[in-house]
Regions:
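Interfacial helix-loop-helix hairpins and adjacent transmembrane helices
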Residues: 1-15, 414-426, 455, 461, ...
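Signature of alpha-helical transmembrane segments and their immediate interfacial
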Residues: 1-34, 429-431, 498-547, 627, ...
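Solvent-exposed, membrane-proximal periplasmic/extracellular interface segments of envelope transport
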Residues: 3, 8, 58-130, 190-211, ...
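Extracytoplasmic/periplasmic membrane-proximal domains and adjacent transmembrane bundles
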Residues: 6, 15, 48, 90, ...
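Transmembrane helices with small-residue packing motifs
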Residues: 12, 20-58, 113-121, 380, ...
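Hydrophobic transmembrane alpha-helices and their membrane-interface caps
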Residues: 25-31, 36, 341-410, 469, ...
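Transmembrane alpha-helices and their membrane-interface boundaries in multi-pass membrane transporters
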Residues: 123, 394-408, 432-451, 458-498, ...
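Helix-loop junctions and hydrophobic alpha-helical segments within the transmembrane domains
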Residues: 318, 325, 329, 405, ...
Length: 1016
């Protein structure tokens, strides 16, 4: 008994099992995590170092280089890249893909800890592995006209942050902006001098007066008491009454030399939202968190806490990743439903039977539900790649059902032998091998895709795994469930089906033309050679990119004001930028950070970013909005360097440390050469069409005031250089000498000189220092003050000095723009032979991805050839059939060119898949060819018999992919090039399979006596 017959005898149990899988898949869909991206551990560890404010050159020698050399010795490290600025350094340690990044991060921490004692005293570091969870999933702003920034900060930090951290899936909640409460002790220098006191003595007195410490235990009356000495300040006035000195003449109180005021910590940052000073709080998810559920939980928690939020405080969300995810889910749902309906129309038009249509269309939701169950078992998530994979698989899923149903209908209705059930059983049994072979042709394409690495593999493994799972499940449904349903629902009388008049006319035209072609089969090259030439022409002219660009509904604007610009002046420039944003009709809301970054890192006071959220559609395309904002800023805010990019592009760039599309790395040991050459290179490439936002890579820090202490003179005064440095720190930064507890927070008490007494170089020069013997002397007696221009950041790549000239692209594709940039550099001769240079950035990632996908394409072709050889044991048959998908690849290039679609990693995925899809259709034709009785008309008859099935599968797949190809809905842009590539290949597959394949088989002299290929 055949397996098909066995399946028919167990129809109820099989259908019940499939129904159970479907129900389980539906249930699993409610538990599957939802995220924007697949969970990917990028092979990059970021080490941030802080060593005070030492110059960049010294920082590079004393801190950066030792750490670089230490982490370079870790096994698996591929490259090390560093950026060193004044007092800080950031080192990117890149590992091979597939490394255990948790272990890699721990190794980096261990290596830095080993050498930490050898680094300058006070050096601190932070090690962070990069993954998509380093960016927030939802963020809010707090603004108010009636509450201070201190109150807003306390509300966010002490009320909202703890409550929101309890939401399931939340990793942490961070707070940016606002002011931190502090008591400021403003010391009058003249009064301090009159009492012969120093700032250090004031600070020591405050610290000693605010103490709570356990001094022992007392056992009395069968009880044990803890004895606590408590001299803490209880009231604001008690600070002023602190005793600084006690003499026989009386006591000196703090109020005698200083004024105490309620103030806030000094800050060199500024945070705004929609033009108002604001406090931002950002929610980060755990790696396995459900973004949509987290966002929903945060919103619900904020509603619960509404009564705890004071009147006059406005809470507004300025970023919500769940909106994009939800929109992508809805567009995927719509794309699937539209695709099913369009495919159903094709079935109904060709077969004219609503039951057939029902059977075929029911397979799609059943297969997708079972696929979701498999994703749940594999601990994957709903994201733009898995959702896109399911949407793209709809056409291929329904194809399996179509070919099985069409074969059953054609065979069962054209035979009078046996009852209806036996005819269906026989038809399904004879189609098992063709269905298995054709399904295998598509499924094995995804085998080499499992070996993808880099950014391509990180994102597209999820898509390929989803599609492969869908197709495997689809095969079993078409093989087992479809025949069972056909036997139960279809009317399979013995009346032979007659094609309608239109079909008869098509068959006649096909027969006439094929008879002429088969008499001279070499004539097929009159079609194939022009197709190859057109494909080559398209290959040379099709635009190329890296990843598809989709409208995410918001973008990031990074900015840098001129080096050394004060925070106040930077803020003034940015208020002009805010005015431009407020006048842009598409802008819904925005937030701004100065001295901070969206990811939470602290930067210089002249740098920062905006996040701009756009209104829902209808509106202008996001690229047009970004171009408009860029033009306005460049015209009205000169001197401000800006960079506009969407969040996904920024995220991928930060995760891979290559954020710019164009990056020209210049290597030389001569720093002066690099600093002279970089502006020339930037000027050269800025003249290339489409190149914008060109940056030299030379980022100088602000000016510095260097205080050179003379050790000999200090020693003569009875002091040491460290004491002078401490006195300067107290004078300029102040000294938080103690803290006062107020409810859940500790409020610092800072001893400081008033601003008007320390705002000039003369004030610093005249700073009075007290020697151990009590005499006072001015700083100028032992030190020299020198103003220094800011040193540029130092970049190194694998321990080599490097400057990276970067640029972005507007209105052009990546491939042609970089070609023009290379041509401009060669023709200008601007880079001397003594300087090594190479291209990095997203272009380098594109080339790495393309090389990998090219190998994948060749591997797919080899696997398809092996499958064909296994199925038919004939090199000639396998070779003839393999030529069909290869020629279809030329059609893919042509389709991309005609639709002006970028040739990127998504369209290359579609091109690889088309090899299997077209082979699948070719197998349908050849399986019919083999089964026909020997005759001279067999090539033509096979085409006529399979024509309906081939047209149905092609049209159904094309229409099912049409919503994706048209870019309907959010998130569809990611799969749009893939859909267009597959559709183009399917369009060309029709003439290739029905016309070119018979001619090639005839040309290869397939044995006509037995209807089988001659075995070599």
């Amino acid at each position: 008994m055949s397996f098909t017959a066995w399946a028919q005898s167990h129809a109820r149990s099989i259908l019940f099992f499939l129904a159970t899988l479907v129900v389980a898949g539906v249930v699993a869909s409610f538990s599957l995590p939802v995220a924007l991206f697949p969970h990917v551990s990028f092979p990059r560890v970021r080490i941030t170092l802080d060593a005070g404010d030492r110059p960049a050159e010294r920082m590079a020698v004393e801190v950066t280089t030792p750490v670089e050399e230490a982490v370079r010795a870790i096994p698996g490290v591929r490259s090390v890249r560093s950026t060193t600025s004044r007092g800080t350094a950031e080192i990117s340690v890149n590992f091979d893909w597939g490394e255990d990044m948790v272990a890699a991060m721990l190794q980096c921490q261990s290596q830095v800890n080993k050498i930490l004692p050898a680094l300058p005293v006070g050096t601190s570091f932070e090690v962070e592995r990069m993954d998509p969870t380093v960016f927030p999933v939802i963020a809010y702003s707090l603004t108010s006209d009636s509450h201070s920034l201190i109150e807003l900060h306390d509300l966010a930090f002490y009320t909202l942050r703890p409550a929101l951290s309890t939401v399931s899936g939340v990793a942490r909640v961070t707070v940016q902006g606002g002011r931190v409460e502090e008591y400021r002790v403003n010391v009058d220098p003249d009064k301090l001098q009159s009492f012969k006191l120093t700032l250090a003595e004031v600070a020591a007195a405050l610290s000693a007066s605010n103490v709570q410490v356990a001094v022992g235990r007392l056992e009395q009356y069968n009880k044990l008491y803890l004895v606590v000495s408590d001299t803490r300040f209880q009231k604001f006035e008690e600070i002023e009454r602190t005793v600084l000195r006690s003499t026989p003449d009386g006591v000196v109180l703090l109020e005698d030399v200083a004024q105490v005021e309620h103030s806030s910590e000094p800050q060199w940052i500024r945070v705004t939202a929609d033009g108002h000073d604001a406090v931002l709080f950002q929610v980060y998810q755990q790696p396995t968190g459900n973004t949509v559920e987290i966002a929903s939980g945060i919103k619900a928690k904020l509603r619960e806490m509404k009564k705890q939020i004071p009147d006059g405080v406005k809470i507004a969300d300025w970023y919500d990743q769940s909106d994009l995810i939800t929109a992508s889910e809805h567009s995927t749902r719509d794309a699937v439903l539209i695709g099913i309906v369009l495919a159903a129309i094709v079935l109904l038009a060709f077969l004219g039977d609503w039951k057939v249509t029902l059977i075929a269309t029911l397979t799609v939701p059943a297969v997708l539900a079972a696929t979701i169950l498999l994703l749940y078992v594999l601990k994957m998530s709903f994201n733009i790649m898995t959702l896109g994979g399911m949407a793209a698989a709809v056409g291929l899923i329904i194809d399996d059902a179509i070919v099985m149903v069409e074969h059953i209908v054609r065979r069962a209705r054209g035979s009078a032998e046996g009852d209806a059930r036996s005819r269906v059983l026989r038809a399904a049994s004879e189609f098992t091998n063709p269905l298995a072979g054709s399904s295998a042709a598509t499924i094995i394409i995804f085998t080499p895709l499992a070996f993808l690495s880099g950014v391509t593999g990180a994102f597209f493994k999820a898509l390929s795994l989803t599609m492969a799972a869908s197709l495997i499940i689809s095969f079993f449904v078409a093989w087992l469930a479809v025949p069972i349903l056909c036997a139960s629902l279809l009317r399979t009388d013995s009346k032979i089906e007659r094609p309608n008049s239109f079909a008869q006319r098509v068959h006649e035209v096909y027969r006439e033309n094929m008879q002429r072609l088969l008499r001279r089969p070499r004539g097929v090259f009159l079609f194939l050679i022009p197709l190859l030439l057109l494909g080559f022409l398209a290959f040379k002219n099709v635009p190329s990119g890296f990843m598809p660009v989709m409208d995410e509904g918001g973008f990031i604007l990074d900015y840098i004001s001129p080096p050394g610009t004060s925070l106040a002046e930077t803020d003034r420039l940015l208020r002009q930028v805010e005015s431009i944003l407020q006048e842009t009709p598409e802008v819904q809301t925005y937030s701004r950070r100065t001295g901070l970054q969206l990811g939470g890192g602290v930067t210089e006071a002249n740098t920062g970013d905006f996040f701009i959220r756009l209104k829902p559609f209808p509106r202008r395309n996001i690229e047009e909005v970004m171009d408009g904002v860029r033009e306005e800023i460049e015209q009205h805010v000169p001197g401000l360097q800006i960079e506009l990019l969407q969040l996904m592009e920024d995220l991928i760039g930060d995760l891979t440390s290559v954020p710019q599309p164009i990056e020209i790395k210049l290597y030389s040991d001569d720093e002066a050469t690099l600093h002279t050459l970089a502006p020339k290179v930037a000027d050269t490439i800025s003249k290339v069409k489409g190149v914008i936002e060109v940056k030299t890579g030379i980022i100088p820090a602000g000016d510095a005031l260097n205080i050179q202490v003379d050790r000999v003179k200090v020693a003569l005064e009875g002091m040491d250089p460290d004491a002078v440095t401490k006195a300067l720190d107290d004078f300029l930064t102040g000294n938080v000498t103690t803290k006062i507890q107020q409810g859940p927070k500790l409020v610092g008490v800072r001893v400081w000189i008033p601003r008007d007494a320390r705002e000039t170089m003369r004030n610093i020069d005249n700073l009075l220092l007290r020697a151990p013997d009590g005499h006072l002397f001015p700083l100028r007696r032992v030190a020299t003050l020198t103003a220094l221009s800011g040193q540029p950041e130092i970049m190194r790549d694998d321990l080599k000095r490097m400057v990276a000239v970067t640029a972005r692209i507007s209105g052009r594709d990546l491939g042609s723009t970089v070609r023009d940039v290379k041509r401009a550099l060669v023709h200008s001769g601007v880079i001397p032979n003594s300087v090594l240079y190479r291209f990095g950035g997203l272009y380098e990632q594109q080339q790495i991805a393309f090389r990998g996908l090219t190998l994948i394409l060749f591997a797919a072709i080899v696997l398809v050839f092996l499958l064909l050889l296994f199925l038919y044991e004939s090199f000639r048959v396998a070779g003839a059939m393999l030529l069909i998908p290869i020629f279809a690849v030329a059609g893919v290039y042509l389709g991309l060119w005609l639709t002006r679609t970028e040739f990127n990693i998504t369209s290359r995925m579609g091109m690889t898949m088309i090899v299997g899809i077209v082979t699948e259709i070719a197998i349908f034709y050849y399986s019919e060819f083999r089964d026909l009785p020997p005759s001279d008309d067999r090539f033509i008859l096979a085409g006529i018999n399979r024509m309906r099935a081939i047209f149905m599968t092609a049209f159904a797949a094309i229409l099912a992919l049409l919503p994706l190809a048209l870019g309907i809905g959010h998130g569809s842009a990611m799969q749009q090039p893939l859909a267009i590539a597959i559709i183009a290949g399917l369009v060309f597959s029709l003439p290739l399979v029905l016309i070119a394949l018979p001619a090639l088989l005839a040309l290869f002299k397939i044995d006509t006596a037995t209807g089988a290929a001659q075995r070599e």
